[in-house]
Amino acid sequence: MSEMTPREIVHELDAHIIGQKKAKRSVAVALRNRWRRMQLDADFRQEVTPKNILMIGPTGVGKTEIARRLAKLANAPFIKVEATKFTEVGYVGKEVEQIIRDLTDIAIKLTREQQMGKCRQLAEEHAEERILDALLPKPKNDWESTDTDTGSNTRQIFRKKLREGQLDDKEIDIDVAQPQIGIEIMSPPGMEEMTNQLQSLFKNMGQAPAKRRKMKIKEAFKLLIEEEAAKLVNQEDLKEQAIEMVEQHGIVFLDEIDKICKRGETSGPDVSREGVQRDLLPLVEGCTVTTKHGMVKTDHILFIASGAFQMAKPSDLIPELQGRLPIRVELDALSADDFKRILTEPHASLTEQYVALMGTEGVKVEFTESGIESIAKAAWQVNERTENIGARRLHTVMEKLMEDISYEASDKSGSAFVIDADYVSAHLDNLVQDEDLSRFIL
């Protein structure tokens, strides 16, 4: 779990997302509260429930990007799902409990990596011995092993060469475990236990014996380290720790939640809208979900929902779900100045990406201050005249602007291009001013 302070989290988000201070502060505080809660006494800790967040803002202003960056900072089980992918229980499609099952799978992977990291040194020692055994096979008979000191010295010489990398390119024959093939079984709701038993049965039946392969020592060493580390991990402890991690630190990001709002009076069942909201209620409130790794309680999982709410309002969500998303954060629409900052300030910004890409062809590209202002203004104008898709418009505008350079770069190694206001005007003015062209091209 991340121990970063709210200020540090916001600083990290600032490196990738422009503006939206309210949203950044809210998710930073929510993430820090996960850590604060774990510092409390066990009895009191159970009473502290997470304050779920609803982020409201137009498309392309940074809602999903905040989720992506938060996943990297959280150092905890984190899953981002689209609310539109689910249907009500009893109908064809994914049910919402699958969110928790997927989150548990993520936690299992995260915990396995952590445990394998802890025993990596021991795994390296075991892998080293196996490679030395392949290089210096043990004698089959006692009479062949009369000079043990010589054999030991030879082994130490090879060990030293192996550690120094002198044997990396030498090929050896070694037995490597075959990867297990996963089998996905579709089952009706309520029959997950039977599905898990069937999967375990097929898994045990399908265990393939180790296969002898010829490979370079450098590749073999990596494979053997992974294999030996996996042997050292206790699977039961792994599952217990992963489930504990999900229950105490898990974060679910529900994107496009506005798309499951009920719009107007409709007849018939709302399989993908209000029905999904009703199914989400017990998850957000706290319930127990059956997974193939064990029972998972959702009482302390943090839910962050987001939506553009252009065709619907937050009040169109069913009241019970509204009450379970107590923190509301509104994200601001982006201005031309924001676009200008997006082009230059974030780490690996769009302009830096194009400069680096063209640099691989030996072409130098320079964006001037006036050029960046013109690009930002063009993107903002197109958003105002047509559909406002936020910062995503910059990708379309930049791709159109750089189209000729990208096409000719391979033939113009050593050339230099300056993207200034005149260059932008020559390539984009006609498209920006013609609303029909803007609608179909930009």
Swiss-Prot record:
GO terms for biological process: protein unfolding; proteolysis involved in protein catabolic process. Belongs to the ClpX chaperone family. HslU subfamily. It holds the Pfam family AAA_2. One of its GO terms (molecular function) is ATP binding. This is ATP-dependent protease ATPase subunit HslU. It is found in: Cytoplasm. It comes from Shewanella sp. (strain W3-18-1). The keyword ATP-binding applies. A double ring-shaped homohexamer of HslV is capped on each side by a ring-shaped HslU homohexamer. The assembly of the HslU/HslV complex is dependent on binding of ATP. ATPase subunit of a proteasome-like degradation complex; this subunit has chaperone activity. The binding of ATP and its subsequent hydrolysis by HslU are essential for unfolding of protein substrates subsequently hydrolyzed by HslV. HslU recognizes the N-terminal part of its protein substrates and unfolds these before they are guided to HslV for hydrolysis. NCBIfam families: hslU, PRK05201.1. It comes from the Bacteria. Its main location: cytoplasm. ATP binds at I18, G60, V61, G62, K63, T64, E65, D255, E320, R392. Keywords: ATP-binding, Chaperone, Cytoplasm, Nucleotide-binding, Stress response.
